[in-house]
A protein has these predicted regions:
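Acidic/histidine-rich catalytic neighborhood of metal-dependent amide-processing enzymes
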Residues: 114-131
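Acidic/His- and Gly-rich active-site-bordering loop/insert found
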Residues: 1-111, 130
Length: 131
């Protein structure tokens, strides 16, 4: 997780930095492909590309019955996660303030908004599919 976060944080991807946003999109697309997602990159001419990652569920569709594992009603329906790939930092911020960890605190442009969220969503989906 931290290696992926470091890769993403060390890429300038401010809202006006199409090249950086496209790099983040490509990295995230590859990560989702590794997990068996069907990936589509939506190319945009003047702004950063977008990524759509789809994967079918692993259980039966929800029919109101109880889960054989827990006895609880489980919904094996759809999950939608929406994230942005850009940050609010200007070009050059990644070089001036690269990803670092001091104690239990990670810093760098986009660590909180939004790159840790990109990594967190990927790992949350991995965990859901492992259930």
């Amino acid at each position: 997780m931290l290696k992926l976060l470091e890769r993403l944080v060390n890429i300038d991807s401010g809202s006006a930095c199409k090249e950086g946003i496209d790099r983040v999109a490509t990295i995230m697309a590859r990560e989702y492909e590794k997990e068996g997602f069907e990936v589509e990159i939506l190319e945009h001419g003047n702004c950063g590309n977008a990524v759509i990652a789809r994967k079918s569920g692993t259980g039966p569709e929800y029919d109101g019955s109880q889960s054989p594992k827990t006895g609880n009603s489980r919904n094996h329906g759809k999950v939608l996660m929406i994230c942005h790939l850009d940050t609010a930092f200007p070009e050059g911020a990644a070089k001036a303030n690269p990803f670092t960890i001091k104690g239990n605190i990670a810093t760098g442009p986009g660590v909180v908004d939004m790159k840790a969220c990109l990594v967190g969503c990927l790992y949350a989906l991995k965990a859901l599919y492992a259930l």
